[in-house]
């Protein structure tokens, strides 16, 4: 696993640096990496395709998606849920049939045992001059017991064994849990419906630039009210009635005073102001988690 003995400066102590390096090289244990700016998506990119959105929509939690991508995801989840429900119902029906078969077999065993006990009884004429306690001794030395009763204690303590054919455990199929019928958001994990999606309209910095030329620019969109440039360093919000994207500074200083959408004049509520989840700038102070972890098997002595 390690290369401690192969290093030219190998010492008697396995250092912490060597342990971390060998852990990263071997793939065992939890792997950690600090994400750089190249690994952070832009604020106007889809959370599924990681590409700039052509027809963007936003969820109530502020996650931006391409309409085609999120609708395809929802349809895929519904088909997957239908498949899981079908498999669950099939296994459930098979288990019911198995339980019924076991109950029928147990009932047949009880009837068979009762008939065998009844057939073994020998009728003898009663002698009125002999007391009832004077009966014939049991030739087999067994105590009389009920014809149908619980299994003996020695049978209860029988453990499964792989080398005795009669005690070999049965290989059973994995029990399926009842699947949830709710489609969830791929980012937040909360329930998501098509009616919860809100269309987003970004205001372009230059209306004369086509879509291809717009993608190549670092600053593509501006605030719909203040015309400030939007980026990962600028907290943004989406107004639900109009779908316009504005800065949070504009929301706090201008929009919250009257709670009126400055684009179409509709009345706003707190639910209509959706804070957009931005990708971050790559700096630790941007408020975005930049530490990625992946759990791997652990090698223990």
Swiss-Prot record:
It catalyses: S-ubiquitinyl-[E2 ubiquitin-conjugating enzyme]-L-cysteine + [acceptor protein]-L-lysine = [E2 ubiquitin-conjugating enzyme]-L-cysteine + N(6)-ubiquitinyl-[acceptor protein]-L-lysine. Pathway: Protein modification; protein ubiquitination. Its EC number is 2.3.2.27. GO terms for cellular component: cytoplasm; nucleoplasm. Its main location: cytoplasm. Belongs to the NOSIP family. This is Nitric oxide synthase-interacting protein. It comes from Mus musculus (Mouse).
């Amino acid at each position: 696993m390690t290369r401690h003995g192969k290093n030219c400066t190998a010492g008697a102590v396995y250092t912490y640096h060597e342990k971390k390096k060998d852990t990263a090289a071997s793939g065992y244990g939890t792997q950690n990496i600090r994400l750089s700016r190249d690994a952070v998506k832009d604020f106007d990119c889809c959370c599924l395709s990681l590409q700039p959105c052509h027809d963007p929509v936003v969820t109530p939690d502020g996650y931006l998606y391409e309409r085609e991508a999120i609708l395809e995801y929802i349809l895929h989840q519904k088909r997957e849920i239908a498949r899981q429900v079908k498999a669950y119902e099939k296994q459930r029906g098979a288990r019911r049939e198995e339980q019924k078969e076991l109950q029928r077999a147990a009932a047949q065993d009880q009837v068979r045992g009762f008939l065998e006990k009844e057939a073994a009884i020998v009728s003898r004429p009663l002698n009125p001059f002999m007391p009832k306690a004077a009966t014939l001794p049991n030739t087999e030395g067994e105590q009389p017991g009920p014809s149908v009763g619980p299994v003996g204690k020695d049978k209860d303590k029988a453990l499964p064994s792989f080398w005795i054919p009669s005690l070999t455990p049965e290989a059973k199929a994995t029990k399926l849990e009842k699947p949830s019928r709710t489609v969830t958001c791929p980012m937040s994990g909360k329930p998501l419906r098509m009616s919860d999606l809100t269309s987003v309209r970004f205001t372009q910095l230059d209306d004369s630039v086509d879509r291809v030329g717009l993608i190549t620019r670092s600053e593509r969109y501006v605030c719909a009210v203040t015309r400030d440039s939007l980026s990962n360093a600028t907290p943004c919000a989406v107004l639900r009635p109009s779908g316009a994207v504005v800065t949070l500074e504009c929301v706090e200083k201008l929009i919250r005073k009257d709670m009126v959408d400055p684009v179409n004049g509709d009345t706003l509520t707190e639910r209509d102001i959706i804070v957009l989840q931005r990708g971050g700038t790559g700096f630790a102070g941007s408020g975005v988690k930049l530490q990625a972890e992946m759990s791997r098997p652990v090698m223990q002595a």
